[in-house]
Amino acid sequence: MENGAVYSPTTEEDPGPARGPRSGLAAYCFLGRLPLLRRVLKGLQLSLSLLAFICEEVVSQCTLCGGLYFFEFVSCSAFLLSLLILIVYCTPFYERVDTTKVKSSDFYITLGTGCVFLLASIIFVSTHDRTSAEIAAIVFGFIASFMFLLDFVTMLYEKRQESQLRKSENTTRAEALTEPLNA
């Protein structure tokens, strides 16, 4: 018997380059774990906090530097934290860690970063020297802090939806258990 006749009906064709598996860094990055709105918000948080940090770094002199230094620390920290959370969501590391812990960490990190970034932007507004780089940094800082807070509100809404869904499942189960068996 010829091998072609035995294996022909069960083997698949070579998928070729169009359908082939992803290679390189693309094989390790998967954006589907976050809904589209959350992906957009995470991308905006990352880019806006980086832009705020870059604009702040362009400032060459200041009279009241405390607000500038605090804003520098917060904008850099916000960029690094949002990059870290995005890396965790998009890489295989997400499957190695408990997903509830990742979501809980993201929830509290996003809330804390948004509040502190908003505070840093308010402080920087009161101490800046009105240069164009400072104004740009302040604008990016406020927008970034609002993106963090909007992401927090989105996560809060998702949590409430999940808890209401679980509550309705529990009540239907309880009703089914209290019905008489011979009815």
UniProtKB/Swiss-Prot annotation:
Gene: CMTM6
Transmembrane segments: 40-60, 68-88, 107-127, 135-155
PTM annotation (Phosphothreonine): residues: T171
Family per similarity comment: Belongs to the chemokine-like factor family.
GO CC annotations, alphabetized: early endosome membrane; plasma membrane; recycling endosome membrane
Cytoplasmic side: 1-39, 89-106, 156-183
A Pfam entry, by short name: MARVEL
Keyword match Ribonucleoprotein: no
Region Disordered, residue ranges: 1-20
Keywords: Acetylation, Cell membrane, Endosome, Membrane, Phosphoprotein, Transmembrane, Transmembrane helix, Transport
Bilayer topology term: Multi-pass membrane protein
Domain MARVEL: 33-160
Function (record text): Master regulator of recycling and plasma membrane expression of PD-L1/CD274, an immune inhibitory ligand critical for immune tolerance to self and antitumor immunity. Associates with both constitutive and IFNG-induced PD-L1/CD274 at recycling endosomes, where it protects PD-L1/CD274 from being targeted for lysosomal degradation, likely by preventing its ubiquitination. May stabilize PD-L1/CD274 expression on antigen presenting cells and potentiates inhibitory signaling by PDCD1/CD279, its receptor on T-cells, ultimately triggering T-cell anergy.
Modified positions (N-acetylmethionine) in chain numbering: M1
InterPro entries: Marvel, MARVEL-CKLF_proteins
In-chain residues carrying the UniProt-annotated modification Phosphoserine: S8
UniProt topological domain (Extracellular) ranges: 61-67, 128-134
Species for this entry: Pongo abelii (Sumatran orangutan)
Protein name as catalogued: CKLF-like MARVEL transmembrane domain-containing protein 6
GO biological process: endocytic recycling; protein transport; regulation of protein stability
